Amino acid sequence: MGKNKKQAAEGEEARRGSESSGSSAEPSGAVAELPSFKKTAGGARSGLIEQDAVDTIREQTAVKFADEDEVVEQDEAAQKTEAVASESSSLADKEECDESKLDHFRKFFRRTSSRSSDEGEGGGMMERFINMTGGGMVPVVTEAPEEDEEAGPDPTAEAEAAAREIMKAHHLSSGQSVDMMSMSSSGESGFFMPVAEHYDDEYNPEQEEEQRDDMSEATYVPPPQHVRGGVLGSLLRLYQNQPGGQAPQRPGLRKSAQTLSSETLPTGESYEMPKFKAKRPRGSKIPNPIKLKRKSAMSEARITVHIADLLQRHRFILRLCKAFMMYGAPTHRLEEYMVMTSRVLEIDSQFLYLPGCMVVSFGDTITRTSEVQLVRCSQGLNLWKLHQVHSIYKQVVHDIISVEDASRTIETIMAEKNLYPAWMCVLLYGFCASMVTPFAFGGDWINLVVSFGIGCCVGLLQFIVAQRSHVYSNVFEITASIVVSFCARALGSIPNSNICFGSTVQGSLALILPGYIILCGSLELQSRSLVAGSVRMFYAIIYSLFLGFGITLGAALFGWIYRDATNETVCEKELSPWFRFIFVPGFALGLSLINQARWSQIPVMVCIACSGYVVTYWSGQHFTASTEFTASIGAFVIGIMGNLYSRIWKGLAMTAMLPGIFVQVPSGIASKSTLLSSVQSANNMVSNGTNAAVNSVDGRTSISFGITMIQVCIGISVGLFASTLVVYPFGKKRTGLFTL
């Protein structure tokens, strides 16, 4: 027992001495002096375990440096991609590395603890060694302070920061720049169109009601805040919304992030992309096919309805324009009417009027293109149909009826026949000629009957022959003036017939005088429509020369046939001036019926026409040498009455004023008797043959007739504009001024 106690004491002293010598050793030996540590641990098995720990530490240190180099390379490659994607990938990679290291050391600790469980003190020594070396990462003797552990990087905190960044990137608004999001192309987002601020593919009833209220409060129809896109833009929008549509690929475009990363990063068997562990559940990137199909169907239906509505509005604008031109709307305000209509319908369009045609351009704000349409038709006068079309125009502008109903109504109006057939118009032509002869050209009762017969011949040529022969319609004015002049001189040459040649010729040609043409031209010039006004004025002058040439040729033909033809241009017998006021209502009635006016419109027309003639007659008695001034006074009165009828009684001013304007033109022409100057030229042609003086006289008379027509119509246009300014000083609220 004594020896055993002595040996135990010596072993305890030796063990304490070895521990003191090991603790006094300097730690500068680091990894290279680790074999000295083996000497302190006795036993072969303990040496193997310690050698395994050293090898594990070296391997993990090398893995750490390799992982850090790999992270640096990945960071350099990820600079060419998006910030959010690169940051999330690097954080996930680092987290994976840390987790793998922790798992490895957990397994190693469990393995060593299981191996040393049978050795007693050896297991405690290994636990102390692992704790002193900081988990095997840095081999030091003393334990690391708690402050250094807290100062080190925390994988959990880094993972939470990365998660917050990913969530922030995931919830970015779609209105931000596309470059900050994923740049990979897809079938839906790969095809981009220019954003149109006025594209109205989303139907919003509340927004439309607010727009209508704003427009009703305005004093005129302003340009719409939102215009409808064109057909081409809608079709492109439909193509874009297709679920299976592929974006068009073009060489030279910017490559996606996946392509850039695959080109810059190394490839091969030695390189493996890091595998990330899903820390939170993520939704599938594949969209729900049922929702996609439903969304595509709704979008297609909405765009289809939009295209159909857009085409319907375009068709209505074209039909309305054609109806206005066919039925005699004021040409100097025609562009204004169409602009008002297009603004109300939210259509981006422009209009250019030329005599006989209208150029219409429909714009498309989506594709920056335009569709040009040309509306051509033969212009005429139909007062009743014009009244109906204007009523539809007002209802559409004030949003009373829909565009579809308005289009169908216009089609019905255009398909209807005229109120009065052609044979009745022929008789009305004779009636008007007989009515205008006494009060405008000084004819008596016998001349009234003769003018009726010759006027029926003119009506036959215009309504029957010219309508059936396009070739004859080009020479109608010349042939009609030749026939009228020849027949009137033949009848006037009958002895003791008391037929006045001058009054008969002028009365029979009163309805084909170019007064309305010159009036429209002067109104267009005064409205700054230079192209249309200049063309119409020049045509009216040439038209007047045609009439003068026809009168001269017809009178000369009868003079060559009958040498004793009459040369008298002034009637011997005239009716009392008071009888003239009786024939004016008849002439206005005949003009209204020829121009297809309804009987309900006639009383207002006749009243306005009679008032204008009374003013013209008495002003002519005072201003004998000023034809244009007299015409302007009469037109001013007619315009005041017509515009008041439109403003107070809500009638159509243009249709009410037109017969009164027609009454003013023959009166102005008769005041200077320019048509009769052609008879003097015809007499000189028959008596003197081909003389130079005769040609000069004929040229002066033809030009003087055209100049007289222009003077009268300019006076009428000035009076009409002055009357409009008095009644409508600020225009109308939403519709254009439908007046002369």
Swiss-Prot record:
Major location category of this protein: membrane
Membrane-topology descriptor: Multi-pass membrane protein
Biased composition range(s): Polar residues: 256-267
Region (Disordered): 1-48, 65-97, 241-269
Compositionally biased tracts (Acidic residues): 67-76
Highest taxon in the source lineage: Eukaryota
One Gene Ontology term of the molecular function aspect: transmembrane transporter activity
Keywords of this entry: Membrane, Transmembrane, Transmembrane helix
InterPro entries associated with the record: ThrE-like_N, ThrE/Ser_Exporter, ThrE_2
Family matches, as Pfam families: ThrE (PF06738), ThrE_2 (PF12821)
Transmembrane segments: 422-442, 445-465, 475-495, 499-519, 541-561, 574-594, 599-619, 622-642, 651-671, 707-727
GO cellular component terms listed in the entry, alphabetical order: membrane
Residue stretches of biased makeup (Low complexity): 19-33
Cellular localization per UniProt: Membrane
Compositional bias (Basic and acidic residues): 7-18
Family of the protein in this entry: Belongs to the ThrE exporter (TC 2.A.79) family.
Protein name in the entry: Pheromone-regulated membrane protein 10
